[in-house]
């Protein structure tokens, strides 16, 4: 928990927000960042600035790592917080539940956002409209505690430039 607090505070000081922290084999610490206004994309210069700052801060705070990687969320960004689930309402996502609902854990569908409860309360319920096995549209209602992971489905336009 200290790790997340330290990194999040440093990112806020630099004008960024934390999306995700991952630890991988070989001592890799991967930090995913975004701009709080969501308007400006993360560039290599942003990643360099954060990497430089964290490479000084982490040793001072006794947070171990061998390699530090800073990145943007990408097209298939993770959807983690209640605010993310509300922000990306109407978009297509891949959602994996911790425990199966109706004999399945994995769903792809349109995120509905907050259905009931307060946004940041543990009893907040979100929705997902997906195509069932019978081809009919179904709605899944879930809380954040039931979600293992969720990612946006990338939308890529290959039309290119018109001459």
Curated annotation (Swiss-Prot):
Q: Name one GO cellular component term.
A: cytosol
The main place the protein resides is cytoplasm
Which InterPro entries does the entry link to?
Ribosome_maturation_RimP, RimP_C, RimP_C_sf, RimP_N, RimP_N_sf
Which keywords belong to this entry?
Cytoplasm, Ribosome biogenesis
What Pfam families does the entry give? DUF150_C, RimP_N
* Highest taxon above the source species: Bacteria
Q: Where is the signal peptide?
A: none
From the UniProt record, give one GO term of the biological process aspect: translation
The subcellular location is: Cytoplasm
Q: Which purpose does this protein serve, as stated in its record?
A: Required for maturation of 30S ribosomal subunits.
Family, similarity comment: Belongs to the RimP family.
What's the protein here called? Ribosome maturation factor RimP
Please tell me the species this chain comes from.
Polynucleobacter necessarius subsp. necessarius (strain STIR1)
């Amino acid at each position: 928990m200290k790790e997340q607090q330290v990194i999040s505070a440093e990112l806020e000081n630099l004008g960024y927000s934390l999306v995700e922290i991952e630890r991988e084999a070989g001592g890799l610490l991967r930090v995913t960042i975004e701009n709080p206004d969501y308007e400006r994309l993360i560039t290599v210069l942003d990643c360099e600035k954060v990497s430089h700052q964290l490479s000084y801060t982490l040793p001072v705070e006794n947070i171990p790592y061998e390699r530090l990687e800073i990145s943007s969320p990408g097209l298939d960004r993770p959807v983690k917080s209640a605010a993310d689930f509300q922000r990306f309402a109407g978009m297509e996502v891949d959602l994996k539940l911790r425990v199966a609902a109706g004999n399945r854990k994995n769903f792809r569908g349109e995120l509905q956002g907050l259905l009931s409860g307060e946004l940041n309360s543990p009893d907040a319920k979100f929705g997902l409209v997906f195509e069932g096995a019978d081809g009919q549209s179904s709605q899944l209602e879930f809380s954040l505690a039931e979600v293992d992971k969720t990612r946006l489905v990338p939308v890529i336009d290959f039309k290119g430039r018109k001459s």
